[in-house]
A protein has these predicted regions:
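N-terminal mitochondrial targeting presequence
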Residues: 1-63
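Alpha/beta enzyme core
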Residues: 40-44, 48-296, 303-345
Length: 345
């Protein structure tokens, strides 16, 4: 039907959609002053609410990162940056900061939902958080973590879960934990056209079988087992793989043997890229909280947030806030009419 529309009409309609129509309401009837102007199609528009999820777009919009982009970066030796996100704001800032991959990791079970470990989170919760992050992410490649219990039973179960992540979670790829035993499952998913990020070394969903959060590959045989896992996952079609809590030298040697990128977390500087949990590295929790050895804190969001909220509390208590500049005006005439109406009622 749209193909029958005259091109001139379509062009006119496009121009009309960008025209800002001035309000016909008298100034005295305006309920509030503009919070900020929006520029749409060159015309300034007025806003009376701050409840918009997006701020101004970046001055220079990045190209969308794809699997092809990541392969090209790997060939050039350009380190791949990966950051977790669990909601719209964390996805938004990670994307604006230029992350190549944003991972909606099941670590959100602990850092966003207050659960004891990653095994508690369920599929529907992960899908909800994936959708939130996906709405904020315009350039980075997004990956969703398949939660425990949604892919281990059979390759068919795993594929069904992966499809839901793409269709309902709106991410571009999925991540799952496990070594060579998961190769048939990964093959099933990648054959269906869904990119898979593998995860070897320390696999947190299996911490009970591993004896807790312990460094893996500290013996020759243990390191060889991880290499075998890596080669099997590569053969199954993974576009990259996370290598967690493995000695730096072991991770570097494994990286050299592979033709796909490795993303290290607690695996030294010889991998193809790095990933950190966002709330850990920006300092989202109070001092004294346990952090793994490999985490470097780049900020103090907890401290800044605490100072801001305490300042707000103090200003509300002292009636310093809201100040006149934070309130909306009413004309003297209308205020007089309203005051009279209140007295007469």
């Amino acid at each position: 039907m749209s193909s029958l529309i005259n091109p001139t009409m379509r062009s006119c309609a496009s121009l009309l959609s960008q025209v800002s129509v001035p309000s016909t309401r008298p100034a005295s009837r305006t309920l509030g002053r503009a919070i900020r102007p929006l520029i749409i199609g060159g015309a300034a528009q007025t806003r009376y609410s701050s409840h918009s999820p997006m701020g101004a777009p970046p001055a220079v919009q990045r190209k969308k990162v794809t699997v092809g982009t990541l392969r090209s970066m790997h060939r050039k030796g350009d380190p791949i940056t990966v950051m977790t996100a669990h909601d719209f704001p964390s996805g938004h800032v990670a994307d604006h900061a230029g992350m190549d991959i944003i991972l909606v990791g099941d670590s959100l079970a602990m850092v966003a939902l207050g659960m004891e470990d990653t095994s508690e989170i369920i599929l529907e919760e992960m899908l909800l958080h994936c959708r939130s992050v996906a709405r904020a992410t315009k350039s980075a490649f997004t990956v969703g973590d398949l939660p425990m219990g949604t892919y281990e039973i059979s390759p068919d179960q795993a594929l069904a879960t992966a499809i839901r992540f793409i269709k309902e979670g709106r991410v571009q790829g999925v991540k799952l934990e496990g070594g060579k035993e998961m190769a048939p499952t990964i093959k099933k998913i990648t054959t269906a056209g869904i990119p898979v990020l593998g995860h070897i070394g320390l696999t947190p969903q299996r911490q009970n079988a591993l004896g807790g959060f312990r460094v893996q590959g500290k013996t020759s045989s243990g390191a060889m087992s991880i290499l075998e896992d890596a080669l099997a996952l590569q053969e199954a079609g993974c576009f990259a793989m996370v290598v967690e809590a493995v000695p730096a030298e072991v991770a570097a040697l494994i990286t050299e043997k592979l033709s796909i990128p490795t993303i290290g977390i607690g695996a030294g500087n010889g991998t193809s890229g790095q990933v950190l949990v966002q709330v850990d590295m920006i300092g989202n929790f109070p001092p004294g909280r346990f952090l793994p050895k490999f985490v470097k804190k780049y900020g103090d969001v907890w401290g800044e947030s605490l100072r801001a909220i305490e300042a707000y509390r103090d200003e509300v208590k002292s009636r310093q806030y809201p100040a006149p500049e934070h309130t909306y005006p009413i004309s003297a005439e209308e205020l007089e009419n309203f005051t009279k109406a209140v007295k007469d009622s």
